A protein has these predicted regions:
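Gly/Ser/Thr-rich phosphate-binding loop
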Residues: 279-287, 296-378, 415, 419
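AMP-binding/adenylate-forming catalytic core of the ANL superfamily
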Residues: 116-119, 123, 133-135, 285, ...
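Structural core segment of the AMP-binding/adenylate-forming
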Residues: 1-6, 72, 76-77, 100, ...
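Conserved pre-ATP/AMP-binding loop-to-beta segment of ANL
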Residues: 47, 158, 179-199, 206, ...
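Conserved AMP-binding A3 loop
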Residues: 59-61, 195-219
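AMP-binding/adenylate-forming catalytic domain of the ANL superfamily
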Residues: 528-551, 568-595
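Conserved AMP-binding/adenylate-forming core of the ANL superfamily
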Residues: 28-30, 39, 47-92, 96-100, ...
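Conserved AMP-binding/adenylation subdomain of ANL enzymes
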Residues: 218-235, 243-283, 298
Length: 598
């Protein structure tokens, strides 16, 4: 354990103070934007590696030069400040150079999800009305599936690879000067100008484009730099998508603004993770909770005890994974946090309390007005009292987390920048909450807060279903299921059953070889009440995730438990024999016909 890590663990207060000190000038609008700051970083850190992957490395000087060239490319195309360019590229050092350069010229860059194709990709392009779409050569076949659904006025430009008839931006910039831009040549964008569109994950419905200002980019970068105490000696391992705020801004920006290096990987590999960490001498790792579970499921590897990681930072680390992950791999510090790209507030667990997503120190309470309000699952809305106002939750009572928006009724609050679609932005705002005229951002997440002020994630709104007259939390059921012997991963959701009120619980399981279904049920009987125990079980080889490692439970729920539609092994709980039995077509017909009671 390094002295710096030990200091962080002993005094979370120091982490908060560092974060406040680094972001104070940004709040006063006394700093440049990140693409402008890159030039100053290049002067200071020069040949030090900024971004690297398996084949390419960009020093700070080389990164700044490319930023200048991409900015000049934007000017050469007569792209005006506020116009949009979409970016459709896999993780690589040039990804950052492209969007930093274009935003240096005042262009807004929309970071497209590289898992999308066809009409879904076209939707993401069309909702931001771009002039150009920059496509990596390796992704051109995927991009062409959307082109017929995009207006002909939108120009496609290739980056690398076989471009066919398309111009290649990476060869065009070679002819452009790499020297520092002057204010006359290219006026710098303001902090409050929009820099990026970052899309919601699309776990339900089509993605929405969230507005991300230069101010937000700088705040995220410097706030996390303070909490993680990043230094020039740090090397961040970033295998999360660069099109998302966590992988693309937090993991990269927090290290770059302090002179460290970012080791990029196109995708996460549980098998290659520890050898990679050791070989690249990484000190930091940006995680999504599911990645930690995948690592725990791997057999022991010699490199898992040879690493030099001092801190892992991320979100979504489940309570049942936290301590086994930290203990097995000897992780000195875990910085778990809660945030949303478009959200008005964030929570941080600087103390490393297992299972908690964060807390708000008393000295910051006035800056971060957050509340948990009683929520009506049936109506899908917060509960209102006789005066029409929302009701705060008691200690350890689950409710929807909301954050007050700045400027509302003269109160302090967080900045809510919303989406490209104004109507979508309005849907996220809850009005007349505790006083007439106030406005709060709706997270859509149910949380509880304990007596010490720690927040705990409970469920997504809509992930609670009703069965046998009782409300069932998918989060609580998932926590019970994933601790059962032989279960590697699980998704829990509700499914409709003809003739039954509410929705029955169903669990999709990834299991180890030799999984004992009877023993699984016995464990659930001990841990869950009858109404919360999954009625249906589906054994799957893997769980499909979004590009940001969120479960696609909506697709599983739509597929349901019909053996003619689902090829995986399906089981239904037979209360008479007290066992999960195979659900075949004959049993399904009896169930649908009302002859098989649940």
């Amino acid at each position: 354990m390094t002295a710096r890590t030990d200091e962080n663990m002993k005094s979370p207060l120091q982490a908060w103070v560092r974060a406040l000190e680094l972001t104070a000038p940004i709040e006063r609008r006394a700093t440049p934007t990140l693409p402008v700051l890159i030039e100053a970083l290049a002067e200071r850190f020069g040949a030090a590696p900024a971004l690297l992957d398996r084949v390419t490395s960009l020093s700070y000087r080389e990164l700044a030069d490319k930023v200048n060239q991409y900015a000049r490319w934007a000017r050469a195309q007569a792209l005006a400040p506020g116009e949009v360019v979409c970016l459709y590229m896999p993780n690589c050092p040039d990804y950052l150079a492209v969007w930093l350069g274009l935003t240096r010229a005042g262009v807004i860059v929309a970071l497209l999800n590289t898992n999308l194709t066809g009409t879904a990709l076209a939707h993401s392009i069309n909702i931001v009305s771009p002039r150009y779409v920059i496509v990596a050569g390796v992704l051109l076949p995927a991009a062409w599936t959307a082109r017929a659904h995009v207006p002909g006025s939108v120009r496609f430009v290739a980056h690398g690879g076989e471009a066919g008839d398309l111009p290649r931006i990476d060869t065009q910039i070679v002819e452009l000067a790499a020297t520092q831009l002057t204010a006359d040549e290219c006026p710098a964008p303001a902090l409050d100008d929009r820099a990026l569109y970052i899309y919601t994950s699309g776990t339900t419905g089509l993605p929405k484009a969230a507005n991300v200002s230069h101010l937000r980019v700088m705040q995220w970068s410097h706030w996390f730099a303070g909490l993680m105490n990043t230094q020039p000696s740090d090397r961040m391992y970033d295998c999360l998508p660069l099109y998302h705020s966590v992988g693309g801004v937090v993991a990269t920006g927090a290290v770059l603004v302090r002179g460290g290096s970012v080791v990029l990987r196109e995708k996460f590999s549980a098998r290659e993770f520890w050898p990679d960490i050791v070989q690249e001498r990484c000190s930091l790792f940006q995680y999504i909770g599911e990645l930690c579970r995948y690592l725990l499921a791997q057999p022991p590897h010699p490199d898992e005890s040879r690493h030099t990681l001092r801190l892992c930072c991320g979100n979504g680390l489940r309570p049942d994974v936290w301590e086994p992950f930290q203990q097995r791999f000897h992780i000195p510090q875990i910085l778990e946090y809660y945030a949303a790209t478009e959200g008005s507030f964030s929570l941080y667990n600087c103390e490393g309390k297992p299972g908690a997503i964060g807390r708000i120190p008393p000295f910051l309470a006035h800056r971060t007005p957050v509340a948990l309000v009683k929520f009506d699952d049936a109506q899908g809305q917060p509960v209102r009292d006789e005066a029409g106002l929302c009701i705060r939750c008691a200690v350890n009572e689950a409710g929807e987390a909301i954050g007050q928006i700045s400027g509302a009724a003269g109160k302090h609050g967080g900045r809510f920048e919303g989406y490209a679609d104004a109507a979508a932005s309005e849907k996220k705002i809850l009005r007349d909450v505790f006083a007439k005229g106030d406005a709060w951002y709706r997270t859509g997440d149910l949380m509880r807060k304990d007596a010490q002020g720690y927040f705990y994630f409970v469920d997504r709104v809509g992930d609670t279903y009703r069965w046998k007259g009782e409300n069932v939390s998918t989060g609580e059921v998932t926590a019970a299921v994933t601790t059962c012997a032989g279960v590697v991963d699980a998704a829990v959701y509700g499914v409709s059953v003809p003739g039954a009120d509410g929705r029955a619980g169903m669990a999709a399981l990834v299991v180890e070889s030799g999984f004992d279904l009877a023993a699984f049920r016995r464990e659930l009987v001990e841990r869950l009440p009858d109404y919360a125990r999954p009625v249906f079980v589906r054994v799957v080889p893997t769980l499909e995730l979004t590009g940001t490692f969120k479960l696609r439970k909506q697709d599983l729920a739509l597929e349901g438990y019909d053996p003619t539609r689902v090829r995986d092994a399906l089981y239904v709980e037979d209360r008479r024999t007290e066992a999960y039995v195979r659900l075949e077509e004959s049993g399904y017909a009896r169930l649908i016909g009302g002859q098989l009671r649940l």
